[in-house]
Amino acid sequence: MNGAMSLPFLRLYLLVLLYFSANAILNVIIPLQGGALGANNTTIGLIMGAYLFTTMFFRPWAGQIIQKHGPIKVLRIILIMNGFALILYTVTGLGGYLVARMLQGVSTAFFSMALQIGIIDALPEKDRSQGISLYSLFSYIPGMVGPLVALGMWQGGMNYFAFGMIAIALVTGVVGYTAKMDKPQTQPSAENTDHHVNMFHSFGQLVKNPHLFKSSVLMLVGSIVFGAITVFIPLYAEQMENGNAGIYLMLMAATVVISRFTLRKRIPSDGKWHPKFMMGTMLLLALGAQCVSYSIIGGVVFFYVGAVLLGVAQAILYPTLTTYLSFVLPPLNRNVLLGLFIAMADLGVSLGGIVMGPIADIFSYSTMYQICAILAMVMILFSMERRKILVR
């Protein structure tokens, strides 16, 4: 494979687009369906959070299993599980949604790790940031049209929803089973390490390794904000005059896609920590959350400006931290440690629904988003680097 934009990689990005298209629809359908059935914010947050909360637990093992068996073998098995989860949505209610979200969470843990590890291993160092950025970009393209498609399904009847989930499951499976990846030229031998010792040692690295710790905390807090936005915007928009959740989510996703494509070459790919770059990213996150909070008073202009600011922040944060860690983590257990880092992103999105849901029940959506803005402001200070971090 030559470069992140070569034909084999474009095929992988197409698979990413198809896989995550279901979630772009589910992120709108589940809160609306839950609200229609009388579920409160806590229940809706629990169901939505179960997806990535489950993913979080399986990420580290996913990285280890993929390192042992290779991404393609794992990918093909996972696509079957994902198809079953999507079909389960079509024949159950809220209780079944919880089970389906958990199955989908397991699938996503292995799917995303398989694709990202395959991309990182196959690309030269100078192209890594572009590869990760394009992976992230294609995972967000469905968000440009998914929310509007979901609203159309909601208004037209759940039969359209059932047909859509089945179609996505089938097409994703076909594309996934024909995908190919180059094997990495060098890779640590699985036989040379004790997997169980490695795993528990790796959990300790989450705190002991300063690179992993700093990146994980930033990703955790950023993901809490993104999770709160994803879960509760469909319900928050209903309280706002002229507010439209479909337009908001589409605008935010479009911003992510455009930003990731236009800024992909500006994302650092040198293995160094760039404090000013990260502080600016967290400032965008804080301003975006504050705009969403204030929009209940200030109007829809602040609502949609918040979508743009949060979209830019989301476009930058994940690929920047992932690329940085791909350089500074020890090669022997890099895949497992990357799995732990991505698990922090999963945990954050889950907490955005599970923890912020009760806060919205007790206070209001506006107050909940105000708290998100405060958390992001704290992370601006956390992004400051007291000592120079270089690749060892």
What is each model feature region?
Residues 1-6, 182-216:
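Juxtamembrane intracellular "pre-TM" segments in multi-pass secondary transporters
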Residues 3-47, 52, 211-218, 223-236, ...:
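Helix-loop boundary and gating motifs at the non-cytosolic
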Residues 49-62, 250-262:
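Central cavity-lining transmembrane alpha-helices of secondary-active solute carriers
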Residues 58-70, 259-273:
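Helix-to-loop junctions at the C-terminal end of transmembrane segments
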Residues 73-87, 276-290:
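Structural signature of the two symmetry-related core transmembrane helices
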Residues 95-104, 301-309:
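Paired small-residue
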Residues 102-139:
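Cytoplasmic helix-loop-helix junction between adjacent transmembrane helices
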Residues 161-178, 369-385:
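Symmetry-related core transmembrane helices of the 12-TM Major Facilitator Superfamily/SLC fold
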